[in-house]
Amino acid sequence: MAIDIGRREFMAALGGASLASPLVARAQQPTAVPVIGFVHPGSADGERRQVDAFNRALSEAGYTDGQNVTIEYRWADGRFDRVPTLLADLVRRQVAVIVAGGGSAVAAKAADTSIPIVFTSGVDPVQQGIVPSLNRPGGSMTGVAFFSTALGPKQLELLLDVAPTAKNIGFVTYAGYPYAKSRIQELETAANTLGRTLVVQNIANQTDIEPAFDALSHQGVGALIVSADPLFLEWREPLVALAARHALPACYGLREFAVAGGLMSYGADLPDAYHQVGVYVARILKGEKPADLPVVQSTKVELVINLKTAEALGLTFPLPLLGRADEVIE
């Protein structure tokens, strides 16, 4: 049976369809997935704990990589000179947020001032010119500061608890690290106060490690502090092995060194710091502005002691010090 439809009804139906179709089309368009750019001067292997903590914070806020957010990692693999190029690539892509880890905050600020940036900083970010104020960072940058330079004097104190006769204290650092100068100054002041002499060895690449230890040995170094540079995580095994070969009690800035056989580590709890970075990134993705998020001052540190290494060196940790350790490796 033919269906008879009047002109008025036809036009009404046509008009309804024409009005509905754009709404349907818009509803069918997929929502753009925000992209987070994650830049670090180290490597994926060395920063695994930090990345896990960062992703955990995002997950707690409802973001999962590969589902409703995409994280693009850019690793410099120990070459700080590559960081500006990695940042420039993310700026060109116009990512939603940039995470500037491992001392790359200054380079991130130079790369762009419009994309939100969440950084980690081992020194005072105000003194570095990263933000004008911790409480009111303003602009497009905020982050987490853990003032790792201030940890050097405490590392020296801990080292002298187990090696009290050491007069010359070695300090191995990476010459290209942005905070190297600040760390040396802090340690020199602390060493002089305690009547010790700081002997500095700068390392530029892995082939410098063995000559640096030979030089420290010739200079009569009795104990050693190894800087918490991201690059050194890649070289932790040769650094720990050479400290053992030269029978040097050593304190490191990162837990991974003690796990690898180093005597002890004392430094910022980096996973905790990167968890907070993840919290801030999630808040920015949800609409908050970096200018309104105060820079977090992380005070959480971790002390890890390796008793097996202490026994090999003929050293004994005082019981009060063992009681303060966050982790004791036996």
Where are these regions (language model features)?
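Short hydrophobic alpha-helices and adjacent helix-cap/hinge residues
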Residues: 1-330
